[in-house]
Curated annotation (Swiss-Prot):
This is Man(5)GlcNAc(2)-PP-dolichol translocation protein RFT1. It comes from Xenopus tropicalis. Pfam families: Rft-1. It is found in: Endoplasmic reticulum membrane. Pathway: Protein modification; protein glycosylation. Belongs to the RFT1 family. Keywords: Endoplasmic reticulum, Membrane, Sugar transport, Transmembrane, Transmembrane helix, Transport. InterPro entries: RFT1 (IPR007594). The chain crosses the membrane at residues 16-36, 42-62, 85-105, 121-141, 168-188, 189-207, 283-303, 334-354, 376-396, 412-432, 433-449, 460-480, 494-514. One of its GO terms (biological process) is protein N-linked glycosylation. It is a multi-pass membrane protein. GO terms for cellular component: endoplasmic reticulum membrane. Intramembrane glycolipid transporter that operates in the biosynthetic pathway of dolichol-linked oligosaccharides, the glycan precursors employed in protein asparagine (N)-glycosylation. The sequential addition of sugars to dolichol pyrophosphate produces dolichol-linked oligosaccharides containing fourteen sugars, including two GlcNAcs, nine mannoses and three glucoses. Once assembled, the oligosaccharide is transferred from the lipid to nascent proteins by oligosaccharyltransferases. The lineage of its organism: Eukaryota, Metazoa, Chordata, Craniata, Vertebrata.
């Protein structure tokens, strides 16, 4: 498959993933807004922070390293060895479920049974759901590697709809069940997800479509691990790469979910405050989840397939390295512009957004300040996602091992900084600590990219510099919307609040127009690779 075809499939995957993330977040926010009226914020804190952290930790530590190693491009790649490697995620997930389950029940603070019953059942249910999801890992890796873009969207959409439907029905009919509702919904979610992948490949293999595609498997039983006396069970080069990523996964998980670990292990916030923080945090991460994460996941596949891992620029094929440089520059430009727009408009609309979503419980106190700080974090999160996407896709094993030490230092500094800044500033301290560490991670990735392209004519990092016209328009928009908030929002009635929204909409249109007119190269990239598929369909 040529680099152009890989790029088209990767952009298609990103588009579908954005749709999936929008569906997921819209349903999640609607569900949170609904459940806030029927269950306590303490239960929301337990589910969204404590139990979800348990589940994501098990899943991440069990599969992340295998995913990165198995999706890396190699001319000698054997899919039999790859499948064997992905199956190791299941026993690893079982081990982590028992180890972390014991910690969650015996070491951490346990809520009072009278206030929040069924906590023990909730812990084991979320651990079981993680193992169920890992059963679909071989199918997920094959689907992702061969860019089955619609499968992921359909599977996760159905699973999300099932979870939300079960939660709403049980909250209405049996609100006294508390954590049992969310535990059952979580198990059904991962079960539906795994069954969708298995059912799809059961139908796909043996069909005419499978015969036409260069798919490496022909029967379902080939997904199962097989021992052979004439062939090694694993590709040890691939296994050692996975081991390097596995060591790194501990540190990356701490950096990704650091504030939740601090909340969970150090008890700096009550369960109720954790619930409020999580809701505000989710609202602040809307764009990150809608756009940035799908871009990172999809274009990691692109970079991993186009670039030879561990090789210098001079050793790469010219067409591939040129394409990778162009894509990296355009992605950096895109996410930087989106992040700057969020900063410019986020300050003036944070209070209104929280007031609409959760009322005075969220818009009062530190909620608006927290969301405004999160706008800066979103910009850093966007840039880091793209730079690390390229970095991890091009690093060799030795580079990954060296980066593990960097991650160790970042993890330790982040935990210490989060703890002390939270004691000093409350929940806002979490966001500021995240900003500091994200800045350090970006700096490391930028230095790596500069070394990677040193001695070549390519300069993809200029994508971090928006045009002066766009910067000026953003500054004016921030000033206008800031004045609009003071004059029209948020305690002056809904009619004036609507006027504040109209002012922001007009400023946003002007900003988008300035970006389209001044960022010609980015506009061409979006039209060529993100919109061309829809244009071909219309023709």
């Amino acid at each position: 498959m040529g680099s152009q075809e890989v790029l088209m499939d990767a952009t298609k995957l990103a588009s579908y993933s954005v749709i999936l993330q929008i569906l997921f977040r819209v349903l999640t926010f609607a569900l949170n807004a609904f459940t806030l009226r029927y269950v306590s914020k303490e239960i929301i804190g337990i589910v969204n922070v404590r139990l979800t952290l348990f589940y994501t930790t098990v899943v991440f530590l069990a599969r992340e390293a295998f995913r990165r190693a198995c999706l890396s491009h190699s001319a000698q790649q054997s899919w039999r060895h790859t499948i064997h490697l992905t199956w190791l995620a299941v026993p690893l997930g079982i081990c982590w479920s028992f180890i972390l389950g014991w910690i969650w029940l015996q070491i951490l603070e346990v809520p009072e049974p009278e206030a929040i019953p069924y906590y023990n059942i909730g812990v084991w249910a979320f651990g079981f759901s993680a193992v169920v999801e890992l059963l679909a890992e071989p199918f997920w890796v094959l689907a992702q590697a061969h860019l089955f873009v619609k499968l992921k969207v359909v599977a996760e959409s159905l699973a999300i709809i099932i979870r939300c439907s079960v939660t709403v029905i049980l909250v209405l009919l049996c609100p006294q069940w508390g954590l049992l509702i969310f535990s059952l919904a979580q198990v059904l979610y991962t079960s539906a997800l795994a069954l969708c992948y298995i059912a799809y490949f059961a139908r796909f293999l043996g069909s005419l479509e499978a015969e036409k595609k260069p798919f490496p498997l022909r029967r379902m039983r080939e997904f199962l691990p097989r021992f052979s006396s004439s062939q090694a069970f694993l590709d040890w080069k691939q296994a050692w790469l996975a081991w390097s990523f596995f060591k790194q996964s501990f540190l990356k998980q701490i950096l990704t979910e650091g504030e939740r670990y601090v909340m969970t292990f150090l008890n700096v916030l009550s369960f109720g405050d954790q619930g409020v923080y999580d809701i505000v945090n989710n609202l602040g991460s809307l764009v990150a989840r809608f756009i940035f994460l799908p871009i990172e996941e999809s274009f990691y596949v692109f970079f991993a397939k186009v670039l030879e891992r561990g090789k210098k620029v001079q050793s790469q094929r010219k067409e591939e390295i040129s394409m990778a440089s162009e894509v990296l520059e355009s992605l950096l430009k895109l996410v930087t512009l989106i992040g700057l727009v969020i900063i410019a408009f986020g300050y003036a609309y944070s209070h209104l957004a929280l007031d609409i979503y959760g009322g005075s419980m969220l818009s009062g106190g530190s909620g608006p300040v927290l969301l405004r700080c999160y706008c800066l974090y979103v910009l850093l999160l966007a840039i880091n996602g793209v730079t690390e996407c390229f970095t991890f896709a091009s690093m060799g094993k030795e580079d990954v091992d060296r980066y593990n030490y960097v991650m160790l230092g970042l993890s330790l500094s982040f935990l210490c900084l989060s703890y002390y800044m939270t004691l000093w500033l409350g929940s806002v301290g979490f966001i500021l600590a995240n900003c500091f560490n994200m800045g350090l991670r970006i700096t490391h990735s930028l230095l790596y990219i500069m070394r990677y392209y040193k001695g070549s004519p390519y300069q993809p990092l200029i994508g971090l510099l928006p045009s002066p016209v766009v910067v000026c328009v953003l500054a004016v928009s921030a000033a206008v919307t800031g004045y609009s908030e003071v004059a029209l929002c948020c305690d002056k009635g809904w009619l004036l609040c609507l006027g504040h929204i109209v002012v922001g909409g007009l400023c946003l249109l002007v900003t988008l127009g300035a970006a389209v007119l001044s960022e010609k190269k980015l506009t061409h990239f979006i039209r060529s690779h993100l919109l061309s598929r829809h244009q071909r369909k219309e023709q």
